[in-house]
């Protein structure tokens, strides 16, 4: 028989940097989960990732206080900031441009994010990436 799911917990944790300090410790602790077990398992699975890459993780919590977790791809804004070589997006996205990304970079980001996006073609994924880029104040060039 399958275990009874009592809840889900969504966190964004830097790759290889999960530790019991806030926000991870309190979030897991108040649900009665083993914090160190999660930290060790997460850090082991994110060894290949670049250090401090934000990794969204969905933790499934079961009635017997056990858990499983699923890692997603880093946020689109992270990839866009890397591609445009900027620290943050524009403060006024409609007026000020923070940087530029090319169509080739947009396609590359769309291919990386494809499994987490709610679309079935690379073209629709590219439109999502372009929309995110525009909302960050990035110009999508040729």
From Swiss-Prot:
GO terms for biological process: translation. Coiled coil: none annotated. InterPro entries: Ribosomal_uL11 (IPR000911), Ribosomal_uL11_bac-typ (IPR006519), Ribosomal_uL11_C (IPR020783), Ribosomal_uL11_C_sf (IPR036769), Ribosomal_uL11_CS (IPR020785), Ribosomal_uL11_N (IPR020784), Ribosomal_uL11_N_sf (IPR036796). PROSITE patterns: RIBOSOMAL_L11. SMART domains: RL11. GO terms for cellular component: cytosolic large ribosomal subunit. This is Large ribosomal subunit protein uL11. PANTHER family: 60S RIBOSOMAL PROTEIN L12 (PTHR11661), LARGE RIBOSOMAL SUBUNIT PROTEIN UL11M (PTHR11661:SF1). NCBIfam families: L11_bact. Forms part of the ribosomal stalk which helps the ribosome interact with GTP-bound translation factors. Keywords: Methylation, Ribonucleoprotein, Ribosomal protein, RNA-binding, rRNA-binding. It comes from Bradyrhizobium sp. (strain ORS 278).
């Amino acid at each position: 028989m399958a275990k009874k799911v009592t809840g889900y917990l969504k966190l964004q944790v830097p790759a290889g940097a999960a530790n019991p300090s806030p926000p991870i410790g309190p979030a897991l602790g108040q649900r009665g989960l083993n914090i160190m077990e999660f930290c060790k398992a997460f850090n082991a699975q994110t060894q290949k990732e670049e250090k401090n890459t934000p990794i969204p993780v969905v933790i499934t919590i079961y009635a017997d206080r056990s858990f499983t977790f699923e890692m997603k791809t880093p946020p689109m804004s992270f990839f866009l900031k890397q591609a445009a070589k900027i620290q943050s997006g524009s403060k006024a996205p409609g007026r000020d441009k923070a940087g530029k990304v090319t169509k080739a970079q947009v396609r590359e980001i769309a291919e990386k994010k494809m499994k987490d996006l709610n679309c079935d073609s690379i073209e629709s994924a590219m439109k999502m990436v372009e929309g995110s880029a525009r909302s960050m104040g990035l110009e999508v060039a040729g």
